[in-house]
Amino acid sequence: PVVLALGHSGSWDRAGAWVCAHGRAIVTVAEKVEPPSLFERFVALREGLGMEIIGVAKGESVFGSLVERVRGRSVIVPLLADRDISGSGIEVDLGRARALVAAGPAALATKLDRPLFVACITYENETPTGADVRVRCVGPVSVPKDLAPGANRVEALTQAWVSEFAAMMADKPQDWHMMQRVFVEDLDPERLARARAEHERKNR
Protein backbone atom coordinates (compact mmCIF):
# COMPACT_ATOMS: atom_id res chain seq x y z
CA PRO A 1 0.00 0.00 0.00
CA VAL A 2 0.88 3.66 -0.48
CA VAL A 3 0.18 5.57 2.73
CA LEU A 4 -0.79 9.21 2.25
CA ALA A 5 -1.37 11.85 4.94
CA LEU A 6 -3.92 14.53 4.04
CA GLY A 7 -5.43 17.60 5.63
CA HIS A 8 -8.94 19.02 5.34
CA SER A 9 -8.12 21.11 2.28
CA GLY A 10 -9.56 21.41 -1.20
CA SER A 11 -11.79 18.56 -2.38
CA TRP A 12 -10.35 15.17 -1.50
CA ASP A 13 -13.45 13.48 -2.91
CA ARG A 14 -12.74 14.91 -6.37
CA ALA A 15 -9.10 13.92 -6.08
CA GLY A 16 -10.10 10.42 -4.99
CA ALA A 17 -12.58 10.13 -7.84
CA TRP A 18 -9.81 10.95 -10.32
CA VAL A 19 -7.53 8.31 -8.80
CA CYS A 20 -10.24 5.64 -8.94
CA ALA A 21 -11.17 6.61 -12.50
CA HIS A 22 -7.55 5.94 -13.48
CA GLY A 23 -7.66 2.40 -12.17
CA ARG A 24 -6.13 2.68 -8.72
CA ALA A 25 -7.86 1.36 -5.61
CA ILE A 26 -8.40 3.54 -2.53
CA VAL A 27 -9.04 2.43 1.03
CA THR A 28 -9.70 5.15 3.57
CA VAL A 29 -11.33 5.97 6.89
CA ALA A 30 -14.32 8.28 7.36
CA GLU A 31 -15.67 9.77 10.57
CA LYS A 32 -19.17 8.65 11.51
CA VAL A 33 -21.02 11.96 11.55
CA GLU A 34 -24.52 12.55 12.86
CA PRO A 35 -27.21 11.79 11.88
CA PRO A 36 -26.34 8.28 10.66
CA SER A 37 -28.30 8.88 7.46
CA LEU A 38 -25.87 11.66 6.54
CA PHE A 39 -22.88 9.40 7.11
CA GLU A 40 -24.52 6.71 5.00
CA ARG A 41 -24.93 9.19 2.15
CA PHE A 42 -21.26 10.17 2.38
CA VAL A 43 -20.25 6.51 2.29
CA ALA A 44 -22.56 5.77 -0.63
CA LEU A 45 -21.08 8.69 -2.58
CA ARG A 46 -17.50 7.60 -2.01
CA GLU A 47 -18.18 3.92 -2.60
CA GLY A 48 -19.96 4.91 -5.80
CA LEU A 49 -16.71 6.55 -6.90
CA GLY A 50 -14.84 3.32 -6.24
CA MET A 51 -13.41 3.88 -2.76
CA GLU A 52 -13.48 1.42 0.13
CA ILE A 53 -14.60 3.13 3.34
CA ILE A 54 -14.04 2.13 6.96
CA GLY A 55 -16.23 4.11 9.35
CA VAL A 56 -14.85 5.33 12.68
CA ALA A 57 -16.65 7.01 15.57
CA LYS A 58 -15.10 9.54 17.94
CA GLY A 59 -12.98 7.78 20.52
CA GLU A 60 -12.92 4.59 18.45
CA SER A 61 -9.88 2.92 16.91
CA VAL A 62 -10.08 1.05 13.61
CA PHE A 63 -6.32 0.77 13.22
CA GLY A 64 -6.25 -3.02 13.37
CA SER A 65 -9.04 -3.32 10.82
CA LEU A 66 -7.27 -0.89 8.50
CA VAL A 67 -3.99 -2.79 8.73
CA GLU A 68 -5.68 -6.06 7.84
CA ARG A 69 -7.69 -4.47 5.02
CA VAL A 70 -4.67 -3.01 3.20
CA ARG A 71 -1.76 -5.30 4.08
CA GLY A 72 -0.20 -6.79 0.95
CA ARG A 73 -2.56 -4.99 -1.43
CA SER A 74 -1.78 -2.54 -4.22
CA VAL A 75 -3.90 0.29 -2.83
CA ILE A 76 -3.59 3.96 -1.95
CA VAL A 77 -4.49 4.75 1.66
CA PRO A 78 -5.21 8.49 2.02
CA LEU A 79 -5.93 9.45 5.62
CA LEU A 80 -7.28 12.81 6.77
CA ALA A 81 -5.14 13.39 9.81
CA ASP A 82 -4.91 17.10 10.66
CA ARG A 83 -7.45 16.55 13.45
CA ASP A 84 -7.55 13.83 16.10
CA ILE A 85 -10.85 12.17 17.04
CA SER A 86 -9.41 9.06 18.68
CA GLY A 87 -8.16 10.44 21.97
CA SER A 88 -4.64 9.26 21.11
CA GLY A 89 -3.49 12.24 19.06
CA ILE A 90 0.06 13.51 18.75
CA GLU A 91 1.01 17.06 19.67
CA VAL A 92 3.01 18.78 16.93
CA ASP A 93 4.15 22.17 15.73
CA LEU A 94 1.69 23.35 13.08
CA GLY A 95 2.79 26.71 11.80
CA ARG A 96 3.48 28.85 14.85
CA ALA A 97 1.34 26.93 17.34
CA ARG A 98 1.01 23.50 18.88
CA ALA A 99 -1.75 21.30 17.47
CA LEU A 100 -3.20 17.85 18.07
CA VAL A 101 -3.28 15.61 15.01
CA ALA A 102 -3.96 11.95 14.29
CA ALA A 103 -1.25 9.33 14.60
CA GLY A 104 -2.81 7.16 11.88
CA PRO A 105 -0.68 7.81 8.78
CA ALA A 106 2.66 7.57 10.58
CA ALA A 107 1.52 4.59 12.64
CA LEU A 108 0.26 2.73 9.57
CA ALA A 109 3.41 3.41 7.55
CA THR A 110 5.53 2.25 10.48
CA LYS A 111 3.43 -0.86 11.12
CA LEU A 112 3.53 -1.94 7.48
CA ASP A 113 7.11 -0.76 6.92
CA ARG A 114 5.94 1.42 4.04
CA PRO A 115 6.98 4.97 3.06
CA LEU A 116 4.76 7.86 4.06
CA PHE A 117 3.75 10.57 1.60
CA VAL A 118 1.86 13.79 2.28
CA ALA A 119 -0.53 15.60 -0.04
CA CYS A 120 -2.05 19.06 -0.05
CA ILE A 121 -5.18 19.66 -2.12
CA THR A 122 -6.13 23.17 -3.19
CA TYR A 123 -8.32 24.92 -5.73
CA GLU A 124 -6.96 26.61 -8.86
CA ASN A 125 -8.47 28.61 -11.74
CA GLU A 126 -11.46 29.52 -9.61
CA THR A 127 -14.54 31.03 -11.26
CA PRO A 128 -18.06 31.77 -10.00
CA THR A 129 -19.16 28.37 -11.32
CA GLY A 130 -16.30 26.07 -10.37
CA ALA A 131 -12.61 25.42 -9.92
CA ASP A 132 -9.89 22.96 -10.79
CA VAL A 133 -8.42 20.77 -8.07
CA ARG A 134 -4.67 20.75 -7.61
CA VAL A 135 -2.95 17.94 -5.72
CA ARG A 136 0.62 18.38 -4.57
CA CYS A 137 2.33 15.34 -3.13
CA VAL A 138 5.74 15.11 -1.51
CA GLY A 139 7.69 12.31 0.02
CA PRO A 140 8.51 9.92 1.22
CA VAL A 141 8.87 11.96 4.37
CA SER A 142 11.41 10.74 6.88
CA VAL A 143 12.39 11.18 10.48
CA PRO A 144 15.46 13.28 11.32
CA LYS A 145 18.73 11.42 10.87
CA ASP A 146 19.77 12.51 14.35
CA LEU A 147 16.65 11.06 16.00
CA ALA A 148 17.68 10.11 19.50
CA PRO A 149 17.80 6.41 20.42
CA GLY A 150 14.53 5.41 22.03
CA ALA A 151 12.66 8.38 20.56
CA ASN A 152 9.14 7.72 19.32
CA ARG A 153 9.36 7.15 15.56
CA VAL A 154 5.63 7.63 14.99
CA GLU A 155 5.71 11.01 16.74
CA ALA A 156 8.76 12.11 14.73
CA LEU A 157 7.24 10.96 11.44
CA THR A 158 3.99 12.75 12.30
CA GLN A 159 5.83 16.01 12.89
CA ALA A 160 7.65 15.52 9.59
CA TRP A 161 4.49 15.19 7.51
CA VAL A 162 2.72 18.01 9.35
CA SER A 163 5.65 20.33 8.60
CA GLU A 164 5.46 19.45 4.90
CA PHE A 165 1.69 19.95 4.83
CA ALA A 166 1.94 23.32 6.58
CA ALA A 167 4.56 24.52 4.11
CA MET A 168 2.35 23.63 1.14
CA MET A 169 -0.82 24.95 2.77
CA ALA A 170 0.83 28.32 3.39
CA ASP A 171 0.39 29.10 -0.32
CA LYS A 172 -3.42 28.74 -0.14
CA PRO A 173 -4.46 28.90 3.54
CA GLN A 174 -8.02 29.85 2.53
CA ASP A 175 -8.45 26.32 1.15
CA TRP A 176 -7.80 24.72 4.55
CA HIS A 177 -11.37 24.32 5.75
CA MET A 178 -10.71 22.97 9.22
CA MET A 179 -13.89 23.87 11.10
CA GLN A 180 -12.87 22.22 14.36
CA ARG A 181 -10.45 23.15 17.12
CA VAL A 182 -7.05 21.59 16.52
CA PHE A 183 -4.67 24.00 18.24
CA VAL A 184 -3.85 22.95 21.79
CA GLU A 185 -4.45 26.41 23.23
CA ASP A 186 -8.05 26.24 21.98
CA LEU A 187 -8.83 22.79 23.41
CA ASP A 188 -10.61 22.10 26.68
CA PRO A 189 -7.94 20.33 28.80
CA GLU A 190 -10.50 18.48 30.93
CA ARG A 191 -12.36 17.20 27.88
CA LEU A 192 -9.06 16.17 26.28
CA ALA A 193 -8.04 14.29 29.42
CA ARG A 194 -11.37 12.45 29.45
CA ALA A 195 -11.00 11.51 25.78
CA ARG A 196 -7.52 10.13 26.37
CA ALA A 197 -8.64 8.19 29.43
CA GLU A 198 -11.55 6.70 27.49
CA HIS A 199 -9.24 5.72 24.63
CA GLU A 200 -6.87 3.99 27.04
CA ARG A 201 -9.77 2.17 28.69
CA LYS A 202 -11.09 0.87 25.36
CA ASN A 203 -7.68 -0.23 24.12
CA ARG A 204 -6.26 -2.03 27.15
Each language-model region and where it sits:
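Catalytic core of membrane glycerolipid acyltransferases/transacylases, capturing the structured
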Residues: 1-58, 87-92
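Non-catalytic C-terminal accessory region of glycerolipid acyltransferases
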Residues: 21-25, 48-49, 60-204
